[in-house]
């Protein structure tokens, strides 16, 4: 998938190994790299469809974060992103997830805290 990171500070922290370790610590930096690499290697978000999501536990957010998705990084932190959808109507959710081939990384945060 195509990954965009509009926030310059977050982009620097996620794309540079030294900055990622400095900002998030060594263990979390490793897990963030794995998640970012997995997302970039995916053909579409359907590769993370919930029944087959694995350790990422990709899911859509609810409440104030509705419209965003998250993947687990290191408890309690999640990588939040917004999907770039090219059309509105889909027959089912899996089809909608398969149409998502570009995402915008928004933040790394504890969504329950």
Question: Where are the predicted features?
Answer:
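Short connector loops at helix/strand junctions that flank enzyme active sites
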Residues: 34, 56, 64-66, 74-76, ...
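Enriched for short, Lys/Arg-rich terminal
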Residues: 69-113
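Residue-level preference for alpha-helix termini and adjacent loops
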Residues: 2-4, 23, 47, 57-60, ...
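Arg/Lys-rich, positively charged N-terminal/basic patches that mediate binding to nucleic acids
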Residues: 1-37
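A short, surface-exposed loop/turn module that caps and links secondary-structure elements
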Residues: 44-67
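Charge-dense, helix-prone N-terminal extensions
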Residues: 6, 12, 25-27, 56, ...
């Amino acid at each position: 998938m195509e990954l965009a990171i509009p926030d310059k500070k977050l982009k620097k922290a996620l794309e540079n190994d030294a900055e990622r370790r400095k900002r998030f610590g060594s263990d979390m930096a490793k897990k963030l790299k794995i998640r970012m690499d997995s997302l970039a290697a995916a053909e579409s978000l359907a590769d993370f469809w919930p029944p087959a999501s694995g350790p990422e536990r990709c899911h859509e957010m609810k409440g104030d974060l509705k419209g965003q998705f998250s993947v687990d990084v290191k408890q309690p932190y999640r990588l939040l992103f917004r999907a770039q959808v090219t059309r509105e109507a889909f027959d089912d959710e899996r089809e909608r997830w398969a149409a998502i081939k570009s995402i915008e990384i928004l933040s790394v945060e504890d969504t329950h805290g």
